[in-house]
């Protein structure tokens, strides 16, 4: 497949599996789950082996696909609304301030936003006024990240339940517009809680080209299954 593929399945509830191409005949394949889902870290190896054998995944993988290395797992911090953001002249950004999305585990966009916000705060307040710079940075994190974080955490809890998950996917599958914008929203082409924060509204906020322009090969495929993938 020349594009990103995402799988949802009952045993990955509040999580998902993915496949996306890399340069050459390579791909990144993996899955993520919430620690609160009841699945133990030690069970992830078993889930991984089973995931690779599922028909939906096999249909995307090349028949002769082989891993380059052993599979690995690591925790992703997602608590930007509960950790210190500064310590005098030190500003915490990215993973250091747990700025990741509670739904997807995505953290690259949050790292860029928090890093840029820290630099802008220092530039605005001046290098000799750390207290003022810290206050500017705190406000920027609240504006850009905290509302999105809390909204994503709320939605993640809804998706933990079968009725909520099925309802969300049915709504996303209504038409081409909802499918396209669900994929863009899920992977944060625009802020998670954009519709709830009018201060961030702008003309064309749902129609821009996004992080990557479509080269004609397709952008994203979302697959829903009522049984394991």
Give the ranges of each region predicted by the language model:
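FAD-binding core/adjacent interface of flavoenzyme oxidoreductases
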Residues: 1
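Residue-level detector of alpha-helix boundaries and kinks
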Residues: 4, 100-103, 107, 153, ...
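Active-site substrate-recognition segment that forms the wall
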Residues: 6-38, 92-93
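FAD/FMN-dependent oxidoreductases across multiple families
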Residues: 13, 35-122, 127
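Short secondary-structure transition/capping segments
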Residues: 33-52, 170-188
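C-terminal helical "tail/cap" subdomain of flavin- and related membrane-associated enzymes
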Residues: 120-229
């Amino acid at each position: 497949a020349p594009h990103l593929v995402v799988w949802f399945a009952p045993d990955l509830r509040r999580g998902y599996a993915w496949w996306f191409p890399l340069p050459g005949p390579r791909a990144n394949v993996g899955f993520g789950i919430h620690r609160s889902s009841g699945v133990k870290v030690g069970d992830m190896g078993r889930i991984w082996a089973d995931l690779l054998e599922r028909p939906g995944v096999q249909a995307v993988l090349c028949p002769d696909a082989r891993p380059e290395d052993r599979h690995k797992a690591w925790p992703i911090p997602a608590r930007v609304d509960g950790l210190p953001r500064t310590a005098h002249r030190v500003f915490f950004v990215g993973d250091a301030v747990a700025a990741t999305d509670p739904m997807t585990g995505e953290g690259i966009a949050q790292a860029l936003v928090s890093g840029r916000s820290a630099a802008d705060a220092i530039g605005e307040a001046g290098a000799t006024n750390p207290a003022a710079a810290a206050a500017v940075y705190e406000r920027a994190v609240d504006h850009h990240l905290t509302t999105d974080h809390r909204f994503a955490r709320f939605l993640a809890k809804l998706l933990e339940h079968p009725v909520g998950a099925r309802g969300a996917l049915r709504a996303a599958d209504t038409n081409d517009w909802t499918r396209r914008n669900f994929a863009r929203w899920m992977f944060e082409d625009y802020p998670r809680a954009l519709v709830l924060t009018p201060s961030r509204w702008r003309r064309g906020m749902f129609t821009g080209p996004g992080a990557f322009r479509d080269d004609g090969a397709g952008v994203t495929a979302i697959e829903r299954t009522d049984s394991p993938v």
